Amino acid sequence: MEKVLVFGHKNPDTDAICSAIAYAELKKELGMNAEPVRLGEISGETQFALDYFKVEGPRFVETVASEVDNVILVDHNERQQSANDIESVRVLEVIDHHRIANFETSDPIYYRCEPVGCTATILNKMYKENGVTIRKEVAGLMLSAIISDSLLFKSPTCTEQDVAAARELAQIAGVDADNYGLEMLKAGADLSGKTMEQLISLDAKEFQMGNAKVEIAQVNAVDTNDVLVHQAELEKVISAVVEEKGLDLFLFVVTDILTNDSVGLAIGKAANVVEKAYNVSLENNTATLKGVVSRKKQIVPVLTEAFQA
């Protein structure tokens, strides 16, 4: 049987990795020869989850067409966030919870996108719909994805469906969602030992906003100053990325997991759009973004609107 690769976006977060594992497992149970892979390094937060539930991380690939003809995308749909040669393969399915942009296919496909906080929430439904029991380890990974995407249920992207799914999955996994979740988020907020290049690419995504090419990277921290003490070095590596990719804006967002506020570091010729979007003034290229924790709901649509205004 021909193999199908299942993967999340480049610079994968916990949902991208864990949903690839969970959906590949469901597809295997349903008779498909599916393998989860990843398009980037595994973060400290994700590694904590994998270690805790004793699951091996997926192997790394940059391109897929040399291996398979068909792929399944989870936690993304935009071409620039996917495998480098995504145009050379057929996308069979997409399971996602983001905006739909820069995506088209030549054939009809199974496309499931729901306005929930996490792909794993959708997968929890799909396991039930197909009558497949979720293994304890996989339930733990799916729970980890929901906790990560919802910042332990505090993000505005978090829905009642996400909370309900997390409670169900925690029961299967045999953990207390709140205690485990805080441990996991703290592991993810430990940025010690990371280079500046790693910091700005840990969780970075490119977007087309009107005519502007924008990259938004986000890291979580227990204290934003722990990251911003390196601002001069960060600006240097960000400026290099802006030049290399021809970006109009690179927004580096440092989110405080205790206060649920963020600080944005904006570099690029369109940095002023951040000021317009949030009604703030950039001082030394930074501004506090009060109550902003979600790239998907509080940054991408706000900036997109500002660029198109």
Swiss-Prot record:
UniProt key word Manganese: yes
Q: What is this protein called?
A: Probable manganese-dependent inorganic pyrophosphatase
Recorded name of the encoding gene: ppaC
Q: Where in the cell is it found?
A: Cytoplasm
Q: Which residues take part in binding Mn(2+) 2?
A: D15, D75, H97, D149
Family to which this protein belongs: Belongs to the PPase class C family.
NCBIfam families, per the entry? PRK05427.1
Q: How is the cofactor bound?
A: Binds 2 manganese ions per subunit.
Q: What class of enzyme is it?
A: hydrolase
Q: Which cofactor does it need?
A: Mn(2+)
Q: Name one GO molecular function term.
A: manganese ion binding
Please tell me where Mn(2+) 1 binds in this chain: H9, D13, D75
Q: Does the keyword Manganese apply?
A: yes
Catalytic activities: diphosphate + H2O = 2 phosphate + H(+)
SMART domains per record? DHHA2
The EC designation for this entry is 3.6.1.1
- Keyword list, A-Z: Cytoplasm, Hydrolase, Manganese, Metal-binding
GO CC terms in record:
cytoplasm
Pfam families named among the record's database cross-references: DHH, DHHA2
Looking up InterPro entries in the UniProt record yields:
DDH_dom (IPR001667), DHH_sf (IPR038763), DHHA2 (IPR004097), DHHA2_dom_sf (IPR038222), Mn-dep_inorganic_PyrPase (IPR022934)
